[in-house]
Curated annotation (Swiss-Prot):
InterPro entries the record matches: Acetyl_CoA_COase_a_su, ClpP/crotonase-like_dom_sf, COA_CT_C
Keyword Lipid biosynthesis: yes
A Pfam family it matches: ACCA
BP-aspect Gene Ontology terms: fatty acid biosynthetic process; malonyl-CoA biosynthetic process
The gene coding this protein: accA
Record's GO cellular component terms: acetyl-CoA carboxylase complex
Recorded superkingdom: Bacteria
Catalytic activity field: N(6)-carboxybiotinyl-L-lysyl-[protein] + acetyl-CoA = N(6)-biotinyl-L-lysyl-[protein] + malonyl-CoA
Subcellular location: Cytoplasm
Keywords, alphabetical: ATP-binding, Cytoplasm, Fatty acid biosynthesis, Fatty acid metabolism, Lipid biosynthesis, Lipid metabolism, Nucleotide-binding, Transferase
One MF term in the entry's GO annotations: acetyl-CoA carboxylase activity
Protein known as: Acetyl-coenzyme A carboxylase carboxyl transferase subunit alpha
The organism of origin for this protein: Xanthobacter autotrophicus (strain ATCC BAA-1158 / Py2)
Summary of the function given for this chain in its UniProt record: Component of the acetyl coenzyme A carboxylase (ACC) complex. First, biotin carboxylase catalyzes the carboxylation of biotin on its carrier protein (BCCP) and then the CO(2) group is transferred by the carboxyltransferase to acetyl-CoA to form malonyl-CoA.
Length: 317
């Protein structure tokens, strides 16, 4: 069953009418309503296109968090063959908020990293809603080092509200783990591509996203703090989250304009959750294109290109 966001109410009402008419037709009362169904379907499609062509930053935030939006597990299944996950940080334990390992992407060996939020109550708890602990970032460093050792590209899929802020995580060195992961990502001698598929929240996101090429899905967000968090700090009022989202410039469109990201991956009309298969296909094409631009670069050239990219961001903003 499709889940609608509050601002999608006009579309929801039209699509509900379409389903009612289809149910009436299937009842076999001899009623011919094909023309009316087609008219309403066209109207609903046009309303959806108009709505998603003019989303506010806050509405994009809600779309990025949509419960039916495809997550890392969906992308991994659709993009990679022979995915072999690796577990544990070899220091404390396993953190399933970050998943990573070896795989093949369109016939080529790669390393893969990504945040997994989970899609059911059970899996959300198991994956800690995609909020990684220190051991998750230390596992990420392990996988980056393997990519470096074998000279194979690293693909990161980012989808987190932020690193886990719990007491245990802080006691085990959360800030240090994020810093080392960010440093390892920047120092990688193999080419890397990061794609923000949903939320890109603060250091928890950038720890695996300091890549040669940074891409974003059309309705993803990428920010130093959540709109609610910014509102609570700036105005002491989370009700101002919509205003914060606008002022923070968190959308893919704004970030491309500022040179923070390199490309935007188009989503189907109505967002990724309406057609996950098409979304994942478009993401795969964008990742393949980004990797092709890095092909032929040796380790020093890859590092220099990445370093220059992020230094340029700092100078231009």
């Amino acid at each position: 069953m499709r889940s609608y966001l509050d601002f999608e109410k006009p579309v929801a009402e039209l699509e509900a009418k379409v389903e009612e008419l289809r149910a009436l037709a299937s009842a076999g009362d001899g009623v011919t309503i094909t023309d009316e169904v087609q008219r309403l379907e066209t109207k609903a499609r046009e309303a959806l296109l108009a709505l998603y062509a003019n989303l506010t930053p806050w509405q994009k935030t809600l779309v990025a968090r949509h419960p039916q939006r495809p997550h890392f597990a969906d992308f991994a299944k659709g993009l990679f063959e022979d995915f072999t996950p690796l577990a544990g940080d070899r220091k404390f334990g396993e953190d399933e908020a970050i998943i990573g390992g070896f795989a093949r992407f369109r016939g080529e060996a790669v390393c893969v990293l990504g945040h997994e939020k989970g899609s059911t109550t059970e899996t959300r708890i198991r994956h800690n809603f995609g909020m990684a602990r220190p051991e998750g970032y230390r596992k990420a460093v392990r996988i980056m080092e393997l990519a470096d050792r074998f000279g194979i590209p690293l693909i990161s899929l980012v989808d987190t509200a932020g690193a886990y802020p719990g007491i245990g995580a802080e006691e085990r060195g959360q800030a240090e783990a994020i810093a080392r992961s960010t440093d390892a990502c920047l120092a990688l001698g193999a080419p890397n591509v990061a794609l923000v598929i949903g939320e890109g929240g603060s250091g928890g996101a950038i720890a695996i996203a300091t890549a040669n090429k940074v891409l974003m899905m059309e309705h993803a967000i990428y920010s130093v703090i959540s709109p609610e968090g910014a509102a609570s700090i700036l105005w002491r009022d989370t009700a101002k989250a919509q205003e914060a989202a606008t002022n923070m410039k968190i959308t893919a469109q704004d970030l491309l304009k500022f040179g923070i990201i390199d490309a935007i991956v188009k989503e189907p009309p109505g967002g990724a959750h309406r057609d996950p298969e098409a979304t994942i296909g478009a993401a795969g094409d964008a990742i393949a294109d980004a990797l092709s631009q890095l092909a032929g670069l040796d380790g020093p050239a890859v590092r220099k290109a990445r370093r220059d990219k992020f230094l340029a961001i700092g100078r231009s903003l």
